[in-house]
Design a protein with these regions (language model features):
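SAM-dependent transferase fold signal centered on methyltransferase-like domains
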Residues: 1-124, 136, 161, 165-172, ...
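Rossmann-like S-adenosyl-L-methionine
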Residues: 88-256
């Protein structure tokens, strides 16, 4: 957004408003991400591009999303715009990469709607492969812009190792990974002794990543479906099918 002096700012919305509270540094965020966002702000001014204004629906850049692979160091930058038209696109991306050579992929996400949702449904890859990878519990995971992935991988590894300990898989179990996202915990279970793993996720892009992750890790005893996990499990129960272990991360209301 713009402050009262018409300077470009970035931060978070004040509660129940569209007023942006400037944030230049976040103690729990990766420092490289903070620096990239500062650079994007400067480039907007250099290229005479305006930030999006939620009240008027005008302006170019709505959000900046930065994702970083904890173990790989790969960095994704997603520029969320209100229009598919990106003036001086190649020069803008080139200037960003010159300042931050650690960036491995840049995407433009197009979100033209008057909505509080951050990401739209259309994406263009401007640089790199369009995704990053990270390693967790001995598996490599592909992460796209819209795919869920735990933001604290150190604690995630502790959580998943504990879940595997509780599951005590012996090689005979059918495991359901409900709301599976990119298939992280399900694929770890598949590698750690499950007979078969079934992952269910409503986000189509996340399911694509889960399937790619199974291939990437040469895991053949896992399959993934794009569906509402709650409805899918009700249908499974109605058909008389059973699972030995159900994994939900995070746990959902009604699961007890």
């Amino acid at each position: 957004g713009l402050d009262r002096k018409k300077r470009i700012i970035s931060g978070v919305y004040q509660s129940s408003t569209h007023r942006i509270v400037p944030v230049d540094r976040c103690r729990i965020e990766n420092e490289a991400a903070d620096a990239i966002i500062v650079t994007v702000r400067r480039l907007l001014a250099d290229f005479k591009l305006l930030p999006y204004h939620a009240d008027t629906g005008r302006g170019f850049l709505r959000h900046v999303l930065v994702r970083r692979g904890f173990s790989t160091g790969q960095v994704m930058v997603v520029l969320v715009t209100g229009s598919p038209v990106f003036p001086s696109k190649n020069h803008f991306v080139g200037a960003l990469l010159k300042k931050h050579p650690e960036i491995t992929t840049v995407l433009q996400n197009i979100n033209p709607g008057r909505t509080s949702l951050v990401l739209g449904t259309q994406e263009k890859t401007l640089f790199g492969p369009g995704f990053i990878e990270d390693e967790l519990c001995g598996c490599v995971f592909r992460i796209s812009a819209q795919s869920f992935y735990q933001i604290n991988p150190v604690q995630t590894q502790v959580l998943y190792e504990t879940a595997m300990e509780y599951a005590a898989l012996s090689g005979q179990e059918t495991v359901v990974d409900a709301y599976c996202g990119t298939g992280t915990i399900g694929l770890i279970a598949a590698r750690r002794g499950a007979k078969q793993v079934v992952g269910v996720e409503i986000n189509r892009e996340a399911v694509r990543d889960a399937i790619a992750n199974a291939k990437r890790n040469q895991i053949k005893n896992a399959r993934f479906y794009c569906a509402d996990a709650g409805a899918w499990m009700r249908d499974m129960a109605a058909a008389g099918e059973q699972a030995d272990v159900v994994l939900m991360d995070p746990p959902r209301a009604g699961s007890d």
